[in-house]
Each structure stands twice: as C-alpha cells, then as structure tokens.
Amino acid sequence: MKYDLVGIDGNAFNIISYVMSAMKECGFSTSDRNDYFKEATSSDYSNLIVISDEMINRCNEIADDVLISKL
C-alpha cells in the first residue's frame, strides 16, 4: 500500500491536498481530480473522510497494478 491517510494531518485541506497529489501521481485527469474535490467538499468532514478513503483505495489499486506489471 503506497498511499495511506493514517498519519496525515487531519486538517481537511491537508487531506484534500494529499489525495489530489496521489491522484495526479496515479494518472488521474484534471477533470477526475476536480470531481473528487467537488464530491469531497460537498458535505461535512465525515463525507470528506469517506470519499478520500475511497479515492486512496483506488490510487493504491492503480499503484499495486503498476508494481505488479514491473515484476
């Protein structure tokens, strides 16, 4: 697992920045990153955490696939 929200400062802006950086590293388009931002900020902090965790899981799946393909 390359990406993890555990250990990240719990400030909402830090979480969003971390997730968006992970998405960029994984090749997500600007449009995808903007969609994440809109969804993550559409409600309360709990929503932000749920949406961010789901996206980090997707990023980890992509990172794992890339790692496996290099073996």
Task: Tell me what each language-model feature is.
Residues 1-71:
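Long, contiguous binding/interaction regions
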